Amino acid sequence: MASSASSSSSPSSRPPLMALPSFYRPPWPSERGGEQRATDCWAGSPAAGGGRARATAMGIDLNNTASGGEEDAPAPGPVCRDLWHACAGPVVSLPRRGSAVVYLPQGHLSAAGAGGGIRGEVAVALPPHVACRVVDVELCADAATDEVYARLALRAEGEVFERNLHGGGIEREDDMEDGDEERKSRMLHMFCKTLTASDTSTHGGFSVPRRAAEDCFPPLDHKQLRPSQELVAKDLHGAKWRFRHIYRGQPRRHLLTTGWSSFVNKKKLVSGDAVLFLRGDDGELRLGVRRATQLKNEAIFKAFSSESSKMRTLSAVADSLKHGSVFHICYNPRATASEYVVPYWKFVKSFNHPVCIGMRFKFHFESEDVNERRSGMIAGVSEVDPIRWPGSKWRSLLVRWEDATDCNSQNRVSPWEIEIVGGSISVAHSLSASSSKRTKLCPQGNLDVPALYGNGRPDSVETEKFPRVLQGQELMGSRTHRATCSPQSIDITKSKSFDAWRFLTDTRSCMLGSSTSRLPVQYSGYTHQSVSFGESIGFPEVLQGQEISQTVPPFQGMLPDACSAKSRYELKNYVCTPATMNGLSSANEGYCLSLSTVPPSPPSSLMLYQTGVPQLELASKNNDKSGNDSQPALRQHKLLSETSWDQFKIGKASTPGNATKPGNGGREVDRTSCRLFGFSLTEKIIPTDKDGEKEVSYETDCQNPRMLDLFGYNCSTPGALHALCAAPLGI
C-alpha cells in the first residue's frame, strides 16, 4: 500500500486523471512490470487479441499464411519522382521550383466539394486569379488509397502581371518540371497492364506480357526445367513486396504467383485497375497502382474538408497577397477535370487567343494510359458563378462534343485546357465586336445575362435596328409587344395630343387587354403605327414573312365584366368609347384621335379581314342624352368582342364606309361588314330594346339579304347568327 501511495503521489508516473478507476484506462507500464506489457496491452486485449499481438511481434501474420508479401514499411521518405508521374498519368505535369503559376481559388473550393464558396458565399475576398511563384514542390501519396498528390508551397506575386503588361519576359513551357520527351527517356523500362478478372481472383496469378517481362524483370535461367525467380519491388511508400516469377504453361507465359494475392487484397484492387512496374537506371524494381475509379484522397480531404480548414487556406492566400508570405495547398491533378493550379504561360496564352462561339477545338484527356484527343465545338462563354467570382475564367466555356463520348459528361472546360483548331467561324457566332462600319450583327453587351423586357419574360439581347421577319410560329406576346415609335406628323396640336393620351390611358383600364404586356404607361409625342392588318389584341399574330413586327402595344386592364354600367359604353365603328370619363375636360371632348394612318397590309387567308378601317373618336356629351341606347350597343359590343377583337384598327378620323342614317332615331348604322370565311357576322342582327320593341340595326329594306348556310341548312332567320355567336358566352 505504501508503494502504491508513493507511486500515486509521483506526478511523472501518473496523469492528472487520478479519480478514474483502473478499468476505465489501460494499465501503465509501472503497473504491468515493463514496457513490453504495455505494448502487448495496446496491441490487443489479453482475452481476445493478446496472443495475436504476440504473434505479430514474432513476425507471424495469422491472416496471411502464404509466403512472400509485404515487408515492414520503413519510415516515410521522399516518393520516387518517376513512379509518381507514372501513377499520375501522362497528362499530369508539375511546375518547377521558382516558376510562375496562377492559382484559382474557385477551382480549389470546387474540388473540395464547396461549390466555389463556403456556405454559399465567399468568406474571404480574393481575386479569381492569383499569380504566384512556386517555392517548393513535395510529391506525396495517400497511404490508404495510393492516390498521388503534390503539396505546393506558393507565394503570391503581383509583379508577374506587371512585368507581362510592360513587355517583360514570360515563362515558357520549359518551366515545367519535366517534359514528355524527358519523361519517356527515363521510363523506357516500364509497363502498365489493366487487371482482368483472372488477375484479381483469389487463387490466380498475374499474367505478364512476354515483352514486358523481358524488358522490366531480370532475365530467367531457361536452362532450368521450371525457370523461376523471386522479385522484390517497392511501392510509393517504400514498402517492399515479394513475388515469385515463373515461366510455365501451355503455351508458356510469365506469371507472378506467390505474394500476388496478398498484394491484391492489401491494395483492394478490382478488375479495371491498372498495375505498373518500373525499373530505373539503378536496376531497382518499383511497383505502382492507378485505379480506374478515383477514391477519396483522405490526405487532401482531411486537409481541406472542414470549414475551418478552408477558411485557414483562403486566409493564408489573402495574407500572401498582402504581405508576401508563403501558403501551402495540396494539389491532386487527377481529382478534378479542370486544374486549379495553371502554369502562367498557359494562362496568358489562352488570353491572347480570343475564343468565339462556333470554334472547333481539341481536348486532351487520359484514357487507359494513352493520351487521347477529342474534338468539340464551343457552344457558349459564361462564368460559372458571376456573383461570387466575377470575371473568373475557370470553366468558362460551354462545349458540345462531336463524338458519342462526352469526356465524363463534362460540358464546361477552361480556355487553357483546349487547343483551337482553325480560326474561321461564322460572323453570327462571333462574340467579339467587328471593326467594320457596317451594322454589326453581333449585339454589344453581356450575352450571358438575359434581358427582361416589358412582357415579363427573359429574352436574349437583340438589336433594335433590324426588323424581325416572323415565319408564323412566334406569338405576339413574346417580343412583338415592344411597339416601335417613329416620329411622324401629328394631326392635332401638342395640347390635344396630351389630352388624347390621357384619354387613352384611362380607356386602357376598362378595355380588354393582354396579360402578357407590362409596359409602363408614359406619355409620348410620337404616334404608334401598326403595319399589320386588323388583328386581335390578345390573340397570336401570324405573319407571312413580309411584315415588320411593329404592333400597337395592347391595352391592359380589367375584363369587360369588370366595367360597370355607370360608364355607359357606346359602339361606334366597332370601338367602345365611354360617354363620360375621368381625366378629360369638357373643352377637349369631341376631338378625334388619330393614332395610325398606315394602310393595312394584304390579309392572310387564316385571319379576319375588315374592309373598312374603323376610327377612334372622342364622344361628346351631346351624344349621350339618354341611357337607353347603351343597352343595344353593349349587347352588340359583347357580340363583337366574342367573335373577334381583331377588327380594332386605330385609323383615320373619317372613313367612307361609315354613314349615319337619319331614319333610325339618330343611331349610327355602320355598313361596313365584318366577315368570317366569307360570311357576314353583322348583317341582319335584330337587337332588342329595353322596352321590348325590336329595332333593325341596319337597313331593313335590303334588297338582297344574305342567307347563311349553317351545318348544311339554308337559314333565313336574321337572328340565327346572333344566337350562334352568343351561345358560348351565354348571352
UniProtKB/Swiss-Prot annotation:
SMART domains: B3 (SM01019). Residues 191-293 bind DNA. The keyword Nucleotide-binding does not apply. GO terms for cellular component: nucleus. Expressed in roots, culms, leaves and young panicles. Coiled coil: none annotated. The gene is ARF3. Residues 1-22 have a biased composition (Low complexity). Its main location: nucleus. Auxin response factors (ARFs) are transcriptional factors that bind specifically to the DNA sequence 5'-TGTCTC-3' found in the auxin-responsive promoter elements (AuxREs). Transmembrane segments: none annotated. It comes from Oryza sativa subsp. japonica (Rice). It holds the Pfam family B3. Residues 1-41 are annotated as: Disordered. This is Auxin response factor 3.
